[in-house]
């Protein structure tokens, strides 16, 4: 699974890219539901959210 760190700028680029709808808007940053996140296995070669994040704030946990 992946996690979005406090460096998130709330740009919303990641949310529509998630094929399993694991990303949602939190109060100040976007949140990844780690129980739903599949690291895009079976969908993409790399996690889609990581690929589109402009500030590289999405990390593997």
From Swiss-Prot:
Keywords: 4Fe-4S, Electron transport, Iron, Iron-sulfur, Metal-binding, Repeat, Transport. [4Fe-4S] cluster 2 binds at residues 18, 37, 40, 49. [4Fe-4S] cluster 1 binds at residues 8, 11, 14, 53. It holds the Pfam family Fer4. Gene3D superfamilies: 3.30.70.20. The keyword 4Fe-4S applies. Its cofactor is [4Fe-4S] cluster. InterPro entries: 4Fe4S_Fe-S-bd, 4Fe4S_Fe_S_CS. Binds 2 [4Fe-4S] clusters. It comes from the Bacteria. GO terms for molecular function: 4 iron, 4 sulfur cluster binding; metal ion binding. Residues 2-27, 28-61 form the 4Fe-4S ferredoxin-type domain. Ferredoxins are iron-sulfur proteins that transfer electrons in a wide variety of metabolic reactions. This is Ferredoxin-2.
């Amino acid at each position: 699974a992946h996690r979005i760190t406090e460096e998130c700028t709330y740009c919303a680029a990641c949310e529509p890219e998630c094929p399993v709808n694991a990303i949602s808007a939190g109060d100040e940053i976007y949140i990844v539901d780690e129980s739903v996140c599949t690291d895009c296995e079976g969908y993409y070669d790399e996690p889609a959210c990581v690929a589109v994040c402009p500030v590289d704030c999405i990390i593997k946990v």
